[in-house]
A protein has these predicted regions:
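Catalytic-loop motifs flanking and including active-site residues across diverse enzymes
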Residues: 17, 66, 142-146, 193, ...
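Solvent-exposed, acidic/polar segments of extracytosolic/periplasmic ligand-binding ectodomains
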Residues: 172-231
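Surface-exposed patches in mature extracellular/periplasmic domains of secreted proteins
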Residues: 3-9, 135-141, 161-166, 182-186
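Sec-exported extracytoplasmic/periplasmic mature domains
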Residues: 1, 22-26, 48-55, 75-79, ...
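Mature extracytoplasmic/periplasmic domains
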Residues: 87-94, 151-193, 202
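Extracellular/periplasmic periplasmic-binding protein-like sensory domains
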Residues: 71-144, 155-161, 204, 210-230
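Extracellular/periplasmic Venus flytrap/periplasmic-binding protein
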Residues: 1-76, 114-123
């Protein structure tokens, strides 16, 4: 993909996501729109601009209902036939029941995908599907990891959490089985972890989901850790 049109909501997270694309993408960015958050759910004007600009791809960050509406309107505009959609936090187990087959074939990036092959993750996904009848989202996976991380510190300290420095030290060891596989902290306490390319597909039972097709970045560190005074 040699050219992209970027879109996201006009608030801190949206600005950060698009800044990350600008910092790392090697092709041409031929347009960018920040839309009003959270009020704007009509993207027809922006989609018309994209059609006129003729990029080779669209990159979006629209969590929740906004992602649902964007995917529907992208398809309704006909751009889904000519301009591929790339996304983060916009197509997932929570939004796919509403986006349905309109999202098929779209690509995204995430630090956790439900088909990651480690045993802890296999058991988590199987148990979740058995109980709820749907795939878990990465919000659920991150929450599970957070619980297991805190539990590992509590167990190491035999339940005595009165000394916060000791609690922090145990948490930083990350001595637990993460759903993401290998998990560790950088010097600035941000995770060092892989990011994966995910494709929206149907599973063998016809349920919409995402699957891993490649590792985008291995042992990724956040871009600013060297500037952090924490060493």
């Amino acid at each position: 993909v040699k050219s992209l049109y970027l879109m996201g909501p006009n608030y801190a997270a949206g600005k950060d996501m698009l800044a990350g694309v600008r910092r790392t993408y090697k092709g041409q960015i031929i347009g960018e729109d920040f839309t009003k958050w959270p009020d704007q759910l009509d993207f027809s004007a922006e989609l018309a601009k994209i059609a006129a600009a003729k990029p080779e791809g669209i990159f979006i960050f629209y969590p929740g209902a906004h992602g649902v509406q964007f995917v529907k309107q992208w398809a309704q505009s006909g751009l889904n036939k000519t301009v591929p959609l790339y996304q983060v936090f916009s197509i997932d187990a929570i939004t796919l029941p509403q986006q349905g087959e309109l999202a098929l074939g779209t690509l995204g990036a995430q630090e956790w995908v439900n088909d990651q092959p480690n045993e802890q993750n296999k058991r988590y996904v199987a148990d979740f599907k058995k109980k709820h009848g749907v795939y878990p989202s990465y919000y659920g996976a991150q929450s599970y990891d957070a619980i297991m991380l805190i539990a590992s510190a509590a167990e190491a300290l035999k339940g005595d959490l009165s000394n916060k420095d000791k609690v922090r030290a145990e948490i930083k060891k990350a001595n637990f089985k993460s759903l993401r596989g290998d998990f560790k902290y950088n010097t600035n306490n941000f995770p060092i972890e892989n990011f994966y390319i995910q494709e929206t597909v149907k599973d063998p039972q016809g349920m919409m989901t995402v699957k891993t097709i490649a590792t985008a970045v291995k042992d990724a560190k956040d871009s600013y850790y060297e500037k952090c005074p924490m060493k």
